[in-house]
Amino acid sequence: MSVKSYIESNKDRFLEELFSLIRIPSISAKHENKPDMLTCAQRWTEVLLSSGADKAEVMPTKGNPVVYAEKMVSPNAPTVLVYAHYDVMPAEPLELWKSEPFEPVIRDGRIWARGADDDKGQGMIQVKGFETAIKEGLLQCNVKFIFEGEEEIGCLLYTSPSPRD
């Protein structure tokens, strides 16, 4: 199977996995969404494991949790670090939305929802590229993922030491 045909044959699954993340209102700026931050981090670990990571974990921090995952192909291979964030901005003012902000809608060939682009969509593109590389036998490097939940409020995590070397 080619890369293009793998992606095409799995497109619906890829979209549903993305939509499951978008439906979680992981708004880092709102204290009432704190439980959603953990839920979203846990969902990312599930997606990463099902996509081919050898391990994935939610790491507690002083703020919102960090998702760490890795796929090690060889101790001698180079390592690529993939960064994304799972937190989103508040959706207000709600009256400006044509649809519910946390219920993804495909309109005119585009996904409309809070987090569809910044940054859950981008994170999913990276993860599904990783999955496709594994399935097609193309992955020749180690891959580590760091997904954090404080980018939208100033990356407070980075005032602390890195959670992993």
Feature map (PLM): residue ranges:
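Short, flexible, glycine/charge-rich loop motifs used to bind or transfer phosphoryl groups or to couple energy/partner
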Residues: 58, 70-71, 101, 133-136, ...
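Conserved small/polar residues in nucleotide/adenosyl-binding loops
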Residues: 158-165
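Active-site metal-coordination/substrate-binding segment of hydrolases
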Residues: 77-147
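Active-site-proximal loop/turn and secondary-structure-junction residues that shape catalytic pockets
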Residues: 151
